Amino acid sequence: MAEKTEKPTAKKLRDAAKKGQTFKARDIVALIVIATGALAAPALVDLTRIAAEFVRIASTGAQPNPGAYAFAWAKLFLRIAAPFVLLCAAAGALPSLVQSRFTLAVESIRFDLTALDPVKGMKRLFSWRSAKDAVKALLYVGVFALTVRVFAGLYHADVFGLFRARPALLGHMWIVLTVRLVLLFLLCALPVLILDAAVEYFLYHRELKMDKHEVKQEYKESEGNHEIKSKRREIHQELLSEEIKANVEQSDFIVANPTHIAIGVYVNPDIVPIPFVSVRETNARALAVIRHAEACGVPVVRNVALARSIYRNSPRRYSFVSHDDIDGVMRVLIWLGEVEAANRGGPPPETRALTSAEPQARDGVAPPGDACADNAFPDDAPPGAAAPNAGSPDGPAPDGGAPARTGDQNA
């Protein structure tokens, strides 16, 4: 068997917590409960109320009803003891929940017959934890002897003075001295409690240590095999259906947000003179659309305002571009035509721009950009000259060069 030298992983600790194997400093919890009870006893346990009940019964002079007598004493006991018990229970439950990180050990509730195994019982009897408990018991005996010695030296006069105390103060003085004795014992036992918690923490992690094979196996179970993980990543990257891919390839251009919205615009004047939305995706699918368009050579125009406007005004795929966005789409189409013409060294193709009659099908809107299209290439321009505004719809390209098909169109 391989030596367990690796620290327990987070998953190992979570699984152990579900089985009830958590770090438990029981003595610290006991210290908190005892200290809480000692400090709360003088305020919650009032012996004068008990004495007053005796006085009330004796002053009546009549034989009390046994049922009513028992009920009165039970009610008085609950009034005195219930707040004290509830406070001590809360003081013990809260540290226990904090130590277990508020994890409910559901599996530890089941009946386990292996706990009755005598072999495992012998192993627990001669384990490191049993040796620790034996040493701790001897230390507590020494702490108790030290506590009695210190208490006798400090409060022996008060203890012997109880013989001369008035009966009305006798109960209160006993409670005060008992509380002082308990707090003094806890103070003397504090080093032992801290040492016990440190050793318990060490033994807890020692029992949950893992060998290297267990760590690798757990990593494979949680993260998956490297080949399987790579295949899963490839499958997750297939965000686009074949239909959307075909729509991207047939689009005239893609206008992007640039990372959260991708809108495909398709124009075919022979069928419909108005552009319509062929692709409409957001977030991860928008990035996939942009990557696929760049791979297929479809122009990608990064124009935040236009992309948001089309996305807002055209709520569905295969719907026409709204009246408010016609001008922006036309500018992009004219710009792309000029870019293609500049790259080929010829005039821009007429199929990239709507004819003068086509925009009239959209509420009589005049074709935007006609002046730019008419003046893009003067008659006396040399062959291969780029359009004056080939860089963008509003200005020339930097350094006089022809811009690429994928550009930035932040209006």
Swiss-Prot record:
SUPFAM superfamilies the record matches: EscU C-terminal domain-like
Region (Disordered): which ranges?
341-411
Tell me which GO cellular component terms the UniProt record holds: plasma membrane
* Presence of keyword ATP-binding: no
Q: Where in the cell is it found?
A: Cell membrane
Where is the major localization of this protein? membrane
Task: Name the NCBIfam families for this protein.
Answer: FlhB_rel_III, PRK08156.1
Q: Report whether Nucleotide-binding shows up as a keyword of the record.
A: no
| Family the UniProt entry places it in | Belongs to the type III secretion exporter family.
Q: What does this protein do?
A: Part of the bsa type III secretion system, is involved in the intracellular replication of invading bacteria inside the host cell. Probably necessary for the lysis of the vacuole membrane and escape into the host cell cytoplasm.
Q: Where is the composition biased (Low complexity)?
A: 370-404
Question: A GO biological process this protein is involved in?
Answer: protein secretion
Keyword annotations for this protein?
A: Cell membrane, Membrane, Transmembrane, Transmembrane helix, Virulence
Task: Report the membrane topology from the UniProt record.
Answer: Multi-pass membrane protein
Family annotation (InterPro entries): BsaZ-like, T3SS_substrate_exporter, T3SS_substrate_exporter_C
Transmembrane ranges?
Answer: 28-48, 80-100, 137-157, 175-195
Record's protein name: Secretion apparatus protein BsaZ
